[in-house]
Amino acid sequence: MTILKVMLMAVLAFSALTGSLFTPAFAAAPAKYKKELSAVATAYAPGPHDNGKWGNLTHIGTQVRPGIIAVDPRVIPLKSKVYIEFPDGTGKYAVAEDTGGAIKGNRIDIAMWTVAEAYKFGMQDVKVYVVE
């Protein structure tokens, strides 16, 4: 196998794990969307520390991973694709696959790989665009 093929496979594997290839932090806000709302965003990680007895699973039974958010399904329906715009002007796409006891109204919880990443994210005021 050539070095180029090995490097390409490594990049694709990393991107698949992190979702970074498909949800870049610099993605543009959607031109068309179903709903726009201001929300408070926090972050969480898989495992009992942040996700309690559900561990690594979301409300719909998928794995907690970057690219997933927890929502109040009365505000953002489960399985919706959303675009999240952060205070610094960057944004990313995510899918609503989880819920949470503290996630009520205009709040979202963004999945991260680690608890340290979730703590670093903190709490931010964001704009959320429901795309599909």
Identify the function of each model-found stretch:
Residues T2-M9, G19-L21, A25-E132:
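Solvent-exposed, well-ordered loop and adjacent helix/strand elements within mature globular domains
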